[in-house]
From Swiss-Prot:
One of its GO terms (cellular component) is chloroplast. It is found in: Plastid, Chloroplast. The keyword Transit peptide applies. This protein binds RuBisCO small and large subunits and is implicated in the assembly of the enzyme oligomer. SUPFAM superfamilies: GroEL apical domain-like, GroEL equatorial domain-like, GroEL-intermediate domain like. This is RuBisCO large subunit-binding protein subunit beta, chloroplastic. The keyword Chloroplast applies. Belongs to the chaperonin (HSP60) family. It comes from Pisum sativum. Keywords: ATP-binding, Chaperone, Chloroplast, Nucleotide-binding, Plastid, Transit peptide. CDD domains: GroEL (cd03344).
């Protein structure tokens, strides 16, 4: 059942965007080498949009939502397992994408029916969240969410209370996460290659390369990916540093698909104070415009007026720039800035040593071969010219560790040494064509993320068998639940846990139900189905391994999405305005022949 009402929504132009639109083109040409300070614009646009309400009185709303879930899950599901297929995605510009990565496929899906589209978006959250936290397991999250929703809708349609059902799902999922941690084991160095290979679609070349990269920079070292110039993959290590600070504003992003800032051969301005006045930066910024080099500003903070100036000039295309807050706090922040200065050969602007921002010139800037910023992290790769200074700095910090008394202080100092001397391993992904390169890079990225997740929380048996084994723990968990309807929620989880293994088997051309029964017939927790070879064997010995963190995130996020879905009873969507007919040309004389 659907009904309509009007709702008013307002949208304000961002000050930076408004300021940009107020610059005449001629002025832009006259001031090509000048930094433009933004002008304020307080115009507000208000628009009204009618909404359509879909109530669930006859079950139609939930059915449509579930259709959207199934369409997305069926599409993403074809990529699951070692014998999963690829999905071809149309690209408006350039060649089509051929991908085997669940979250990339999920992001591209927009369904025509608005209610079905909401269902698809809802389950897409499970993939996106798993990707953000674990970097892999996105397809499994979607398939598991589909299973929980399918089983849940059946019992809710039969009259069960959705509130108690979802409470049972939540309690069971939490208990299963605790059981999962008991099944987990710490990953050995020899197993890292297997973890990466499984995630890369059974590609052992990629697995071995990632294991080699981690052996060179350490388990907690930084590994980045680049597009190679040849058809072969390659690995090299350069000195570099990574810390937990991302760009201040998303307007600095240079790659809108990955939401990252990437600069090569760029300069760094290091400021140990808050930047309050944009005019203090003009000398440095006009140097950057004239010389054409990208610049990254690392400061204690940047106030809104100064930030608006940077954003406006970046969006106008006159300046390649990004800004971020310095890592750490207080004295530790100053030490981090000094570390960055030594790595890049720059000078930290500090008033107490007689350096002021308004008098600074390009002599104080550091140099970096590459800088990559995400919303949460920054990676700085040096140009190799400061290795001697870096070694001296590391020796100084080691002396401080020996003198430090508190464990926390020693830990933080050791962290600084790792950032300075650990270096960055760079994997260059090679391929014959651009289409193959994009697909291959996504696989390697998944493999790298899976390996990092395995280092963090350990590993479990792969191939969907760990989730299937968890189902056998549900009966014991049911005894702790308060009432029968919560126990029904636990049964929903139990049935849904077999969905990923069944789909892996189906994609390998085998009956999923037969496979799951055969796996459960053995009491050996490592026994399972190897879809790559078609054999039943000890999966841990065969190298079929999943990171515990990935399996945990799949379970948590799929159950979270399923709870939200099953509690829904009404859907609100915008009514699409009909496209207006094109206005005819009043001077059209076509009816009178050619003139």
């Amino acid at each position: 059942m659907a009904s309509t009402f009007s709702a008013t929504t307002s949208s304000c132009n961002l000050s930076s965007s408004a300021a940009i639109s107020s610059f005449p083109l001629a002025a832009g040409k006259r001031n090509a080498n000048k930094v433009v300070l933004p002008r304020k614009n307080r115009n507000v646009k208000v628009s009204a949009m009618a909404k359509e309400l879909h109530f669930n009185k006859d079950g139609s709303a939930i059915k449509k939502l579930q259709n959207g879930v199934n369409k997305l899950a069926d599409l993403v599901g074809v990529t699951l397992g070692p014998k999963g297929r690829n999905v071809v995605l149309e690209s408006k510009y350039g060649s089509p994408k051929i991908v085997n990565d669940g979250v990339t496929v999920a992001k591209e899906v927009e369904l025509e029916d608005p209610v079905e589209n909401i269902g698809a978006k809802l389950v897409r959250q499970a993939a996106a969240k798993t990707n953000d936290l674990a970097g892999d397991g996105t397809t499994t999250s979607v398939v598991l969410a589909q299973g929980l929703i399918a089983e849940g809708v059946k019992v809710v349609a039969a009259g069960a209370n959705p509130v108690l059902i979802t409470r049972g799902i939540e309690k069971t999922s939490k208990a299963l996460v605790a059981e999962l941690k008991k099944m987990s084991k710490e990953v050995e160095d020899s197993e890292l290659a297997d973890v990466a290979a499984v995630s890369a679609g059974n590609n052992h070349e990629v697995g071995n390369m990632i294991a080699e990269a981690l052996s060179k920079v350490g388990r907690k070292g930084v590994v980045t990916l680049e597009e190679g110039k040849s058809a072969e993959n390659s690995l090299y290590v350069v000195e570099g540093m990574q810390f937990d600070r991302g760009y201040i504003s998303p307007y600095f992003v240079t790659d809108s698909e990955k939401m990252t800032v990437e600069f090569e051969n760029c300069k760094l301005l290091l400021v140990d104070k808050k930047i309050t006045n944009a005019r203090d930066l003009i000398n440095i910024l006009e140097d950057a415009i004239r010389s054409g080099f990208p610049i990254v500003i690392i400061a204690e903070d940047i106030e809104q007026e100064a930030l608006a100036t940077l954003v406006v000039n970046k969006l106008r295309g006159s300046l390649k720039i990004a800004a971020l807050k310095a890592p750490g706090f207080g004295e530790r922040k100053s030490q981090y800035l000094d570390d960055i200065a030594i790595l890049t050969g720059g000078t930290v602007i500090r008033e107490e040593v007689g350096l002021t921002l308004d008098k600074a010139d390009k002599e104080v800037l550091g140099n970096a071969a590459k800088v990559v910023l995400t919303k949460d992290t920054t990676t700085i790769v040096g140009d190799g010219s400061t290795q001697e200074a870096v070694n001296k700095r590391v020796s100084q910090i080691k002396n401080q560790i020996e003198a430090a008394e508190q464990e926390y202080e020693k830990e933080k100092l050791s962290e600084r040494i790792a950032k300075l001397s650990g270096g960055v391993a760079v994997i260059q992904v090679g391929a014959q064509t651009e289409t193959e390169l994009k697909e291959k890079k996504l696989r390697v990225e998944d493999a790298l993320n899976a390996t990092k997740a395995a280092v963090e929380e350990g590993i479990v048996v792969g191939g969907g068998c760990t989730l299937l084994r968890l189902a056998s723990k549900v009966d014991a968990i049911k005894d702790t639940l308060a009432n029968d309807e919560e126990k029904v929620g636990a049964d929903i989880v139990k049935r849904a846990l077999s969905y990923p293994l069944k789909l892996i088997a189906k994609n390998a051309g085998v009956n999923g139900s037969v496979v799951s029964e055969k796996v459960l017939s053995s009491d050996n927790p490592k026994y399972g189905y190897n879809a790559a070879t078609g054999k039943y064997e000890d999966l841990m010995a065969a190298g079929i391994i999943d990171p515990t963190k990935v399996v945990r995130c799949c379970l948590e996020h799929a159950s979270s999405v399923a709870k939200t879905f099953l509690m829904s009873d009404c859907v609100v969507v915008e009514i699409k305005e009909p496209e207006s007919a094109p206005v005819g040309n009043p001077m059209d004389n076509s009816g009178y022949g050619n003139i």
